[in-house]
Amino acid sequence: MHPHGVLYDKDNEGADGGAGASVAPGKRYTYTWVADKAAGPGPADPSSIVWLYHSHVMGEEEINLGLVGTLVITRKGMARSASNPLPRDVDQEFTVLFMIFNEENDKESGLKHTINGRNFGNLDGYEARLGKRVRWHVAALGNEQDNHTVHWHGQTVLAHGRRTDVVEVLPASMTSVDMVPRSPGDWLLHCHVNDHMLAGMATRWRVLP
């Protein structure tokens, strides 16, 4: 399991050459990663940022089988408590991974255009309240097809000082943006690349009054 961003030594890299390069079936390995200052938010970042981690043994095949996840790191002194890392300057954090899972060796029928592994609106649980502070952690992974333009209907986000309603992510890139919902209702969240959206890379999320 290979992480991005955090501090690790060779045995905890999760790639060729270290003790943790691979874990055999039925075996265990404990990785040690450090969220040091260089892994946390930079001066121009929001108070929490996102990193990816994923398999690096048969990277392409195993990532396409779902061996991928995210880490969120909060700036030192900004967490609500030792047991609650949610930053004090936001009310909620959401994480979304935009990825085309390739399950059948590039055959179109095996390309699953997903948000968090779900497509065609089958992603539940994303609700916020009007006027609350919401941070969206957005990531992408995959191949040259995984250039995504993430679009929120009805709302805008603040992305590194820039106001927009679309953010761009490339394969293995990550970004964190802030939103204060201003319009209640059920809203689309989707990739604005036309064939990605039509193939199912879209869902609804809810803003409560």
Q: Model regions: which residues?
A:
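Copper-binding active sites and cupredoxin-like electron-transfer domains
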Residues: 1-209
